[in-house]
């Protein structure tokens, strides 16, 4: 089998506390927004966003690696959920 050329993929990773976990940062932001007059804000949940560039042969391989990174390091599966989007960079 011939070697495939590596492509660059951009993984956009979103990590957020699970809905059942208290979010003190989100509560603080919510209070700040309300005190600034943004009375229509009902709630805020804070999270993390990361962009990771990967050299992989296929989108499936990039997806597997991103999942592995999230599960092993980036997200704490006990209290956080994650999702990601992949795009091939030209």
Tell what function each PLM region has.
Residues 1-90:
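Long, contiguous binding/interaction regions
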């Amino acid at each position: 089998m011939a070697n495939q050329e590596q492509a660059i993929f951009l993984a956009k990773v979103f990590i957020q506390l699970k809905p059942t976990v208290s979010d003190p940062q989100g509560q603080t932001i919510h209070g700040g927004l309300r005190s600034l007059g943004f009375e229509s804000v009902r709630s805020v949940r804070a999270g993390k966003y990361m962009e990771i560039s990967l050299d992989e042969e296929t989108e499936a391989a990039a997806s597997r690696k991103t999942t592995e990174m999230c599960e092993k390091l980036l997200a704490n599966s006990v209290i956080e959920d994650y999702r990601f989007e992949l795009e091939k960079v030209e």
